[in-house]
Amino acid sequence: MITVEAATNAGAFYATRTLLQLGENNLQNGEIRDFPSFSHRGFMLDTGRKFIPYDTLVDIMLNMAYYKMNDLQLHLNDNYIVLNKHVEGKHLSQQGELDYVLKNAKTGFRVETDVVGDNGEKLTSKEHYTKDELQQIISLAKDLHINLVPEIDTPGHALSFVKVRPDLMYKGPLSANKHNVERVAMLDLDNKYEETLAFVKSVYDKLLVGENAPLRGVSTVHIGTDEYYGSPENYRRYVHDMIQYIKDKGLTPRIWGSLTAKPGKTPVDWNGVEVDIWSLGWQNPQAAIAKGAKIINILDVPTYSVPNGSNSQGPYSDYANYELQYNSWAPNDFTARRGPRLEASNPNIIGGGHAVWNDNIDLHETGLTSFDIFKRFFKSMQSTAERTWGSDRAAKTYADRIQPTSVYAPRSNPEKTIEDSDLFTIKPETIKEYLAKNVKKTEAGLNFEKDSSIEGLVGDLSLIHI
């Protein structure tokens, strides 16, 4: 007989995950007492640059829950990061550069909205999550005891906003020797502060408020705020105002920590704000704690993956340095970037996570699939899960770990494998039973023209069935 006792529903749920994992081997008699060291065990996915389909998100959540991860941050808008590549060798004027990049650089906003600019530009990208899909994702996350955190990134990384409102493009001086075209992804906080703030809030209102709001039901909202190269004082004012806006809705604000790189006199209230510590140059973790913030260790080294297909492992590489993360990282440990090792018992250190950034799009497109992205998430997730749970009985090094015999969570199928019993064959005489595009029946068989596809009840079909 197996008896499960827990103080909360989440505790009982995690006990069942343990039993499922033990079921991969032989169950033994005994008593298990299990609890996490940190309350936040997270993953950040960039679906703003590279759209990750709904079914892949479901597989990610199922596997997070299986490994007792409980926070999924979805980076829902962003743009090609190396914007100046678009104008190299073109010898354009400064205004010509801005116009060219605004028109041609790839950007994404992945939430269904009806926001359209006076110029006819839609805020929402062609590839996006519908309102129903987002509500299903939020509902599933709650069932799996995962905190689903949508991120809408402004005032930088905001090309999708500027395309709709080009009049709100930043016109002021740029810091950090940034190229002129960086402005197309920056909102104007100098000359049009009130207009910019009102526009951004109006978008958030559509996302969060009302029966048809696609993100209704979330408890934490990430407002972005990283890598803005305009005025520090106006930036600080904007961060403060957006934090207060989210708090006034009864929600928990989360941001990318950046005040160390943006010093100034303008106060920013960080009490109760969750701060992603991603770069020690942008944000000192001790300074964030001193301001009352709850910090999350998602330091770029060793937790960032920037998929490129090279199979490399390391800082900003195809795979994050998951071995270094396991061996030398914990939510309270920032020494991988020569930062401090803080007391793990500090209540303002709520946990840590890892991230997959899809920077390689547009002129750097790699052709990687959503399953390729899943693999990079999954490889680091095992290190994140163990180091944020924090058991003192875990293997001391990555090499000493015992690999699970069943890699993926029950009910998940990230590889989209098909049982032999479910296989079928499409023949010229049966093609009419499927929704076919640019596929023609000929005397020699089936002829596939450019952009051809076949769709059946199981979705898109591959050539293995033909």
Please state what every model-predicted region is.
Residues 2-184, 195, 201-218, 357-360:
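Feature activates predominantly on carbohydrate-active enzymes
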Residues 41-45, 72-74, 148-152, 221-223, ...:
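Hydrophobic faces of well-ordered beta-strands that scaffold small-molecule active sites
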Residues 464-466:
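Conserved small/polar residues in nucleotide/adenosyl-binding loops
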Residues 436-459:
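Extracellular carbohydrate-recognition regions
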Residues 48, 77-81, 153-157, 226-228, ...:
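Active-site beta-loop-alpha junctions enriched in small/polar residues
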Residues 178, 183-272, 279-280, 285-286:
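Active-site neighborhood of glycoside hydrolase catalytic domains
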Residues 1-36, 253-262, 271, 406, ...:
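Acidic, contiguous N-terminal accessory segments
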Residues 266-273, 279-442:
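Flexible, acidic glycine-rich loops studded with aromatic residues
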